[in-house]
Amino acid sequence: MDIATLVVVGLVIITALTFDFTNGFHDTANAMATSIATGALKPKTAVIAAGTLNLVGAFLSTEVAKTISGGIINEQAVTIGPEFIFAGLVGAIIWNLLTWLVGLPSSSSHALFGGLVGAVIIGAGIEGVNFGAVLAKVLIPALVSPIVAGLAAFVAVKLIYFIVKKMSKEQIVNGFRHGQTVTACLVALSHGTNDAQKTMGIITLTLIAVGAQGAGTGPQLWVVAVCGLAIAAGTYMGGWRVIRTLGKGLTEISTPQGFAAEAASATTILVSSHMGFALSTTQVCSGSIIGTGLGKPGNKVNWGVAARMLVAWLVTFPAAGLVGAAACALAKTGLGGTIAVAFIAVVAALVIFRLSKRNPVNSGNVNEASEVKIKPSTSTKVATAA
């Protein structure tokens, strides 16, 4: 392995772990939004628990990682350079940060797949993508999983309210608040078994691409460990902006609803991880929350927020793909092009973080509103007033 390739591989691993970190704080909401919204868990306690269980979950299975490293990209038919994978990761990270900025719970998984597919098509040609695997392991689960989780949550919440109809409100709240502690932890654990593995698969694919690991092999232990730590660290940061949208924006959530939503989500994700389906945990959790909103008598679903989320889901794959393709077009020109892409990505990330400071969302104010709005800068307000 020459020096230039070694530098690019190192850059890919760092970028992959950065994506894993953004996945953690972007998707913390999946596990903890409903428990925080109902008061079952304090915000900081929730993210500490979620981070710890994401780390544990990362060690429980590698089936999804194998889908990424040896499934959707046809590394045996074409030569996949590490710079292609790097470009795909850049596409995923930029889209993750943009949707985090506006508080949209879009799919980190689909951002990753979209960025990777776009980069590989530009870098190696359309034959570099195994579209059969993309359809069977990614797109079909993306359509089916939120519906399954939503139906399960709908039935569960109907059953719960039938069983507890003679109980006092205090008994219901206290009982299901304890139950939510368990189910929220299960969702966090299941998130680790699915989402952390995607980055493991990316790093493994990179090692296979440069001949450092045999084709068809799974992730090495050090890869599992660093990916688990990265997603746990990101989760600990708390994706408060997305937590606000999921916990307050879709529907008003009671403790029985939170319990039902989390139980349905955890079951769907764990079964899918065991089968190697690289589904979107965001879509699963959103579907289950909508299911509970429809299932509770007299409750309403905010279809405006749901529509915004649906648009984000539909746009994520192609949008990340376009960014990944553009990044690959520059990165494949050589080491200088790859470094230029890295510089542009860092600048874009800094701009997004600066914009987020105009309307910060944190553990202290996460439940104070139902959506995230980006406030104009002071200079903009002055200019408008003038």
Describe the residue ranges of each PLM region.
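Multi-pass alpha-helical transmembrane bundle typical of ion/small-solute transporters
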Residues: 1-386
